């Protein structure tokens, strides 16, 4: 390569700021986190173009993310994906004890890009205003994100019975497609996802290390494209096109009367375990929407046949986990897996689904 090539010398100048405050009040603790990352302010069309924008955020930096990392399956699938190059936000977390058998947890997170974006007369993206120190919660052109999560944990029957109930409500503008303005009118298109989730977890511990656990999660998930248009200060267009539909006609083609306002998801897991050796779990993942390509009966697995489950909207599997040692764990899964987005510490990856198969995983912890 040529060291004088502009590609290798045109580095971007950026910076990142993170702050954390902890306050302890008797049986309560308050944690406040703040992030202001501006390694590169890329426009909405180039936000993910790291090939042509060399020298921005690097994965090895791995800075804090200041959002809640969900343990629950359905909420984790719609996790906000942090823009490490340009994001300003904060997280407020309150946790503690109401009494000696009830714990409380409440978390509020908010973030956005540092600038709003609009298109000029040549349809070129331009930044609007000065860089913000706090999130633009009311400016959709800055792709805002907001989430509240609350949780109560109950410890009963001499700490043998553990009940945990939660509630989550999130709002996330994930992509800005268009934002034009004139003296008398404006038009904006953006991708929006909203989620309300209610997780419930019940576990009971017996003598000699035996325990049973039940997890039930329900989610109402909205995703689609919203269009907002104004003329002379009045809103003349405000429409939402949902991504989800229910194929009532069984023709695998989305029709106008089949679109749903939101997707309803259910996740159920029943497990039994013998600490510290093994655990066995039965899992059912259910939705009310249709896939663009129907799975078809040819992919029906043994578990779906046994329980007479509609395989087009349900995924069912059995997983056995064995602890070979204190640091090595073996997992064997059979059935179908919905897959989807899984996020850990701001790093998200897609888990590929399958309809009839096995999965083996060997984990070593250092």
Predicted feature descriptions by range:
Residues 1-366:
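Exposed, low-structure sequence patches enriched in small/polar residues
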């Amino acid at each position: 390569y040529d060291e004088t090539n502009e590609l290798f010398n045109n580095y971007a100048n950026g910076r990142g700021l993170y702050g954390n405050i902890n306050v302890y009040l008797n049986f309560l603790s308050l944690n406040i986190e703040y992030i202001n990352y501006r390694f590169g302010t890329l426009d909405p069309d180039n936000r993910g173009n790291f090939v042509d924008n060399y020298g921005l955020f690097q994965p090895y930096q791995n800075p804090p993310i200041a959002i809640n990392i969900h343990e629950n399956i359905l909420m984790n699938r719609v996790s906000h994906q942090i823009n490490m190059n340009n994001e300003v936000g904060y997280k407020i977390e309150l946790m503690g004890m109401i009494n000696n058998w009830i714990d409380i947890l409440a978390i509020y997170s908010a973030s956005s890009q540092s600038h709003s974006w609009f298109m000029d007369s040549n349809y070129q993206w331009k930044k609007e205003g000065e860089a913000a120190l706090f999130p633009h919660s009311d400016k959709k052109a800055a792709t805002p994100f907001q989430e509240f999560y609350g949780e109560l944990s109950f410890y009963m029957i001499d700490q043998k019975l553990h009940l945990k109930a939660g509630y989550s409500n999130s709002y996330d503008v994930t992509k800005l497609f268009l934002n034009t303005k004139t003296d008398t009118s404006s038009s904006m298109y953006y991708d929006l996802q909203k989620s309300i989730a209610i997780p419930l977890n019940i576990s009971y511990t017996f003598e000699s290390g035996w325990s049973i656990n039940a997890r039930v999660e329900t989610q109402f998930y909205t995703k689609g494209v919203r269009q907002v248009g104004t003329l002379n200060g009045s809103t003349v267009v405000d429409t939402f096109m949902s991504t989800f539909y229910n194929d009532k006609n069984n023709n695998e083609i989305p029709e106008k009367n089949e679109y749903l306002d939101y997707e309803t998801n259910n996740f159920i897991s029943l497990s039994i375990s013998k600490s510290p050796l093994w655990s066995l779990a039965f899992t059912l993942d259910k939705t009310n929407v249709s896939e663009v390509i129907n799975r078809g009966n040819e992919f029906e697995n043994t578990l779906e046949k046994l329980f007479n489950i509609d395989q087009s909207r349900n995924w069912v599997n059995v997983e056995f986990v064995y602890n070979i040692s204190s640091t090595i764990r073996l997992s064997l899964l059979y059935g179908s897996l919905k897959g989807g987005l899984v996020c850990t510490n701001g790093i998200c990856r897609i888990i590929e689904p399958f309809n009839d198969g096995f999965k083996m995983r060997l984990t070593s912890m250092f």
